């Protein structure tokens, strides 16, 4: 059973999947930082210094106006649409980057497929048989 598990775990697809998940997690952290530390502050500056991460709709009377989102969540129920907006921007960026990567891979793949395949040289014995056939056909005419 241990040997069977070893074969399964070391198969190419499982290892490739593990590498993909690890790289994906690291890429997610980079995109998170890009959105939260670069894009959202720019959007906030353009819109007059708004911090979208603290935008919410209180659903409880215990939540007071002006409370930070994290504190408001502790006090009562809130709908954090600012946080949702930030995550939607994250998703859009990740989807766009993945689209560009897959598009680039498809272009490279189509270029590779478009290259003319090398024509295999006909073996000498087949070539000789073809010449004999042609000579015999010429005699009949």
Curated annotation (Swiss-Prot):
The keyword Lipoprotein does not apply. It is found in: Cell inner membrane. SUPFAM superfamilies: Gated mechanosensitive channel. Keywords: Cell inner membrane, Cell membrane, Ion channel, Ion transport, Membrane, Transmembrane, Transmembrane helix, Transport. The chain crosses the membrane at residues 14-34, 38-58, 82-102. Its main location: membrane. It is a multi-pass membrane protein. GO terms for cellular component: plasma membrane. The keyword Iron does not apply. It holds the Pfam family MscL. GO terms for molecular function: mechanosensitive monoatomic ion channel activity. It comes from the Bacteria. Belongs to the MscL family. Channel that opens in response to stretch forces in the membrane lipid bilayer. May participate in the regulation of osmotic pressure changes within the cell. Homopentamer. This is Large-conductance mechanosensitive channel. It comes from Methylorubrum extorquens (strain PA1) (Methylobacterium extorquens). The gene is mscL.
């Amino acid at each position: 059973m241990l040997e069977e598990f070893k074969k399964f775990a070391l198969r190419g697809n499982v290892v490739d999947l593990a590498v993909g998940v690890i790289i994906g997690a690291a890429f997610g952290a980079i995109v998170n930082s890009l959105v939260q530390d670069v894009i959202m502050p720019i959007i906030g500056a353009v819109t007059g210094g708004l911090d979208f991460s603290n935008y919410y709709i209180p659903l409880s009377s215990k939540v007071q106006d002006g409370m930070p989102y994290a504190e408001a969540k502790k006090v009562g129920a809130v709908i954090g649409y600012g946080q949702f907006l930030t995550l939607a921007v994250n998703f859009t960026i990740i989807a766009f980057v993945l689209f560009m990567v897959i598009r680039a891979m498809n272009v490279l793949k189509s270029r590779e497929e478009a290259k003319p395949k090398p024509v295999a040289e006909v073996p000498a014995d087949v070539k000789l048989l073809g010449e004999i056939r042609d000579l015999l056909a010429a005699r009949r005419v």
